[in-house]
């Protein structure tokens, strides 16, 4: 059991960063800007959990300075110009510039030759990260001719639908009649010209009838009548008893014969009753 505990402690101490290493991350951009001197990148301060415990070793520092990558240890003046106008915690990203250039090239005429963005290489061959966002020529043409105004369904149907055949005068007159004629009021209105000649229909504003002098064309049934139809019936179902004191011998419960029924209908009814009897 003791050996297992000792091995655990030994592994924990071996895994601890006894020799702190240099941190080159984006969070140290402020220190990177402050430590630039004469176009040379100075070593950043050591960061680690045991900085206060371990004294500096000059031999190790010299070895670490010699073992630095040549591309990161020295920067040219052209590379330092990019860091000059930046705030802390910001690094140059050439991909954004190339993205803007790519969109501008896509909006230009596709017939013109497209020149790729030139990337300047520093003397120490430090290649910046360049992400090309160029659009192909087909997408550029599609964006250039993209329709701005789209036809709505009803507008498209109005444009593509064939014209309806010309309507007759009677149909036009029925369509032009307002809705309040259904309630009995017929205003004075002029009928459109008929094929047989110029005929004018003068309507009576009081009775809603038309004079007999109007001649309708052949095949058209007039819907206005001269005579006024009386819908009142003589025997409307209301019984008024007589006020005389003499008794009446009439049977009030007998059905009254409608005088409008013709004798032919009575004979036909009698024949059907005779045939129904056994």
Swiss-Prot record:
Its main location: secreted. Transmembrane segments: none annotated. GO terms for cellular component: cell periphery; cytoplasm; cytosol; extracellular space; mitotic spindle; nucleoplasm; nucleus; supramolecular fiber. It is found in: Secreted; Cytoplasm; Nucleus. Residues 97-123 are annotated as: Disordered. Residues 127-129 are annotated as: Interaction with ARHGEF5. Residues 1-15 form the signal peptide. Residues 107-123 have a biased composition (Low complexity). Keywords: Biomineralization, Cytoplasm, Glycoprotein, Nucleus, Secreted, Signal. InterPro entries: Odam (IPR026802). Pfam families: ODAM (PF15424). It comes from the Eukaryota. The keyword Hydrolase does not apply. Glycans are attached at residues 103, 115, 119, 168, 246, 249-250, 272. O-glycosylated. One of its GO terms (biological process) is odontogenesis of dentin-containing tooth. Interacts (via C-terminus) with ARHGEF5. Belongs to the ODAM family. Tooth-associated epithelia protein that probably plays a role in odontogenesis, the complex process that results in the initiation and generation of the tooth. May be incorporated in the enamel matrix at the end of mineralization process. Involved in the induction of RHOA activity via interaction with ARHGEF and expression of downstream factors such as ROCK. Plays a role in attachment of the junctional epithelium to the tooth surface. This is Odontogenic ameloblast-associated protein.
